[in-house]
């Protein structure tokens, strides 16, 4: 497929996402809102977009105010829709839930509508990340050449739909991206970097090359069977834990956008019990179960690369 055809499909798919989201938000407002609870988080400024989040203060919104914030959030796709001081790199998150009373016909209609939106979002992400054939560093410029100001993460994010929950609880999740590597795999990556000299602020080209050579020597000095691990922290994420009474099971969802809960009164479902979201404090985290960690030694800080002792 030619690059021109891909751009046409990209723009066409995005227009469909916008149209279907507009139709969904209009549709939801026609139905009976049983309960709505969302939690706005502080705005991340451009100056603080790379800073670690040690505390997050939560503001609760209820009822029609919460619904209005949620419906606007679903359609928040461009930086032009937010403050000029707000970071365009930090994710815009609004955890919470909207609960609507539905019958069988309305439930099926909304399920189909949301499924279609999620299919379009997945297709759009596939075009950008796979079909474009571009490395991650080049995708930003390519997407914004055709859709200026797009917040790509908001365009990718699918909507979460649940049916007849008994309870909904919110919380925070701290995660790490973990990848196991061999010594030779790391040496191969460093060798590629050494073969393409460049400057990386605040280092000059020569200083960066020297830094890479030192890293290469440190890894080469390890035994060939050394166990290496990238353990990169991910910014804390809001989550929702859903309990289904009939199935006697709990399901956990990431909750960057308000969940849509359909309460089917044809099937005798009742209004769920919805909890709040506490402020986040990194110094006050309680782990239900924390397994004994493997002893690790940091060897290349910029890569979050550790070696198992």
Curated annotation (Swiss-Prot):
Show the Gene3D superfamilies listed in the entry: 3.30.54.10, Replication terminator Tus, domain 1 superfamily/Replication terminator Tus (3.50.14.10)
Pfam families xrefs: Ter
Gene Ontology MF term list: DNA binding
> Which GO terms fall under biological process for this protein?
DNA replication termination
Is-annotated flag, keyword GTP-binding?
no
Could you tell me the keywords of this UniProt record?
Answer: Cytoplasm, DNA replication, DNA-binding
Domain of life according to the entry: Bacteria
Q: Tell me where it resides.
A: Cytoplasm
As for what it does, the entry says: Trans-acting protein required for termination of DNA replication. Binds to DNA replication terminator sequences (terA to terF) to prevent the passage of replication forks. The termination efficiency will be affected by the affinity of this protein for the terminator sequence.
Its family?
Answer: Belongs to the Tus family.
The record ties this protein, via HAMAP family, to: Rep_term_Tus
* Protein's name in the database: DNA replication terminus site-binding protein
Protein source organism: Salmonella agona (strain SL483)
The gene for this chain is: tus
């Amino acid at each position: 497929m030619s690059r021109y055809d891909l751009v046409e499909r990209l723009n066409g798919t995005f227009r469909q996402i916008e149209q279907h989201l507009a139709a969904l938000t209009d549709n939801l407002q026609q139905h009976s809102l049983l309960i709505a609870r969302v939690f706005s988080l502080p705005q991340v400024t451009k100056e603080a977009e790379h800073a670690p989040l040690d505390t997050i203060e939560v503001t609760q919104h209820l009822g029609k105010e919460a619904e209005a914030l949620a419906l606007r959030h679903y359609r928040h796709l461009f930086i032009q829709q937010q403050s000029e001081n707000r970071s365009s790199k930090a994710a815009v998150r609004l955890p919470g839930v909207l609960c609507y009373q539905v019958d069988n016909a309305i439930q099926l209609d909304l399920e189909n509508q949301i499924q279609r939106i999620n299919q379009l979002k997945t297709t759009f992400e596939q075009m950008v990340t796979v079909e474009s054939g571009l490395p991650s560093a080049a995708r930003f410029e390519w997407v914004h050449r055709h859709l200026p100001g797009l917040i790509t993460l908001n365009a990718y994010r699918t909507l979460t739909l649940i049916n007849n929950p008994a309870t909904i609880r919110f919380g925070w999740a701290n995660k790490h991206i973990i990848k196991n590597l061999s010594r030779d795999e790391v040496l191969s990556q460093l060798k590629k970097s050494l073969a393409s000299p460049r400057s990386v602020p605040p280092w000059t080209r020569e200083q960066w090359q020297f830094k890479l050579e030192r890293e290469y020597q440190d890894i080469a000095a390890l035994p060939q069977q050394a166990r290496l691990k990238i353990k990169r922290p991910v910014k804390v994420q809001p989550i929702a834990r859903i309990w289904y009474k009939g199935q006697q099971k709990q399901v956990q969802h990431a909750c960057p956008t308000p969940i849509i809960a359909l309460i089917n009164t044809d099937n005798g479902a009742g209004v769920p019990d919805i909890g709040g979201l506490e402020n986040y404090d990194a110094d006050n985290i309680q782990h239900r179960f924390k397994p004994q960690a493997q002893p690790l030694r940091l060897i290349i800080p910029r890569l979050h690369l550790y070696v198992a002792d």
